[in-house]
Amino acid sequence: MTFEFCGGESSILGGAWVCIYQTAEDVGFQREHFEQAMDNVIRHPNINSTVLLRADIVAEREYDCRTGEAVRDGNCGAAADVAEGMLSVGLEDVAARSVHTELDLAVKLEFVRRLVPRNPYKDALINQTCLVLNTREPSETALVVYLPHFSEREDCPFYIPPVAAVGILLHGGRLSVHYIPFAGEGAALADEGQRAVRTARRLLQTAEKHSKGCMNGYTKRVEHDVVVDKVLFQERYIQLKKKYSQWLVDNWAESTDPRKHVFEDIAIAAFLIELWSKIYGQHAEDKFRFCDMGCGNGVLCYILLMEGYAGEGIDARRRKSWGMFPENVRSCLKEQLVIPSLLLRPHPEIRKMASHMEHNGGFFPVHVSSSQLMAPATIVYSAADLITSPQVNIAEFPPNTFLIGNHSDELTCWIPLLGQPFMVIPCCSHNFHGARVRYRPSRESATRLGNSTYAGLVDYVEYLAKAVGWETEKEMLRIPSTRNAAIIGYKNPALGQFPTQQVYDEVLKNGGAEGWIQSATALLKGTPKSH
């Protein structure tokens, strides 16, 4: 679709308005498609600006265009609170505003929304009226208007155009964007290089693209905010980012990009804290402990520990970043190999008959090579030695433990089998030997996530969890990663009875786990992975 710059020409909407951009030809979609698309954009302003986190709908009303009478008041949730230090402009003004046009239009939908930026300590929260107007008689004309609740140019935050009103018009088969400029600023809108003019083009592109999507029957591939409420998560994220992000970025000790890892782990911490509040209720931090299996750089553990949650992180290799944390955090980060106890303990049925048996008598050869050896050698570990080794964690946790697998790679498929409530965010696909493998995705997952190794892994982890009795939930996390599916399980009738026979059966169905100890010891020599 080609867009024509109007150069600040007079607008069909009237003398106060200025036309900025319009489509060069008919758009092809109908008014209903335009209104459906713009309703979604009004409710999700982050579509137009990545600076914005969300919109809280303060008021919503529908009118009969012919009579002007209100026919529906929408149910509106609470608007965002403004914490100390956050910026805001005119939030006490919640009365819907109106606008004059020379077209014979009447209000169909009226919203007052509160725009919440990602960093409200830098960008101000504002209220804004959003109107959807139609002609009184049936036609294909519709207008969407945005009216900020301030009247001075100086009050305008960076994330919206610096104008008094924005109009997106569908009329005569074409789409166009119009502004009402602040006093004395109309001449600047004739310059295509101005930020407000460039923004008008993006607004037109978004409206045209999303309207065509509605016409073509577009549906979202994934749903967010299924398990944890979006507002609760986002408010928690803002709090944690304010407290921890700057220090973590400034003191980053790894060679990886600090901003990606820091903000991703802050988002995961925010999600976990709200999830735990949902599961355990008030004062959740007093009711359980966490274990982050494959904790990597330790940032997630650091945030959770600093927020008052008891727990620990385990990884096969110590990271440089561990040294930057305070002693109370460093003492909770453990350099250990995870070797699940079901590989070392007697089968539960055998222990019933011989309760004195602490290990299964197994021996595990591990091939090693070194420049200090005359030739490759084999070390044989016994189950008894591995159970008592301080360098090994056999994943026998207290009953009030919640397991976290945040891109935990080789451990991912093991975590649902360990008999504790868990959240796993799969990343790289491995079997119970620790070897790379590709699992086939279901038809549904292939449609939503693509016919990929990742989709297959997510499906397999969910299958494993259900096979051993977990009621599972899935959430597509709001994190800066394409591998953002979280599988969650915290209800299981067999809780306290693991490892069950189903656990042994699933390990055997997937080829057993004889190679796990060899693979686990190899992790000690490899380079730590970065996701």
Swiss-Prot record:
It comes from the Eukaryota. It holds the Pfam family AdoMet_MTase. It catalyses: uridine(44) in tRNA(Ser) + S-adenosyl-L-methionine = 2'-O-methyluridine(44) in tRNA(Ser) + S-adenosyl-L-homocysteine + H(+). InterPro entries: SAM-dependent_MTases_sf (IPR029063), tRNA_uracil_MeTrfase (IPR011671). It is an enzyme of class 2 (transferase). SUPFAM superfamilies: S-adenosyl-L-methionine-dependent methyltransferases. GO terms for biological process: tRNA methylation; tRNA nucleoside ribose methylation. One of its GO terms (cellular component) is cytoplasm. It is found in: Cytoplasm. PANTHER family: TRNA (URACIL-O(2)-)-METHYLTRANSFERASE-RELATED (PTHR21210:SF0). Probable adenosyl-L-methionine (AdoMet)-dependent tRNA (uracil-O(2)-)-methyltransferase. This is tRNA (uracil-O(2)-)-methyltransferase. It comes from Eremothecium gossypii (strain ATCC 10895 / CBS 109.51 / FGSC 9923 / NRRL Y-1056). The lineage of its organism: Eukaryota, Fungi, Dikarya, Ascomycota, Saccharomycotina.
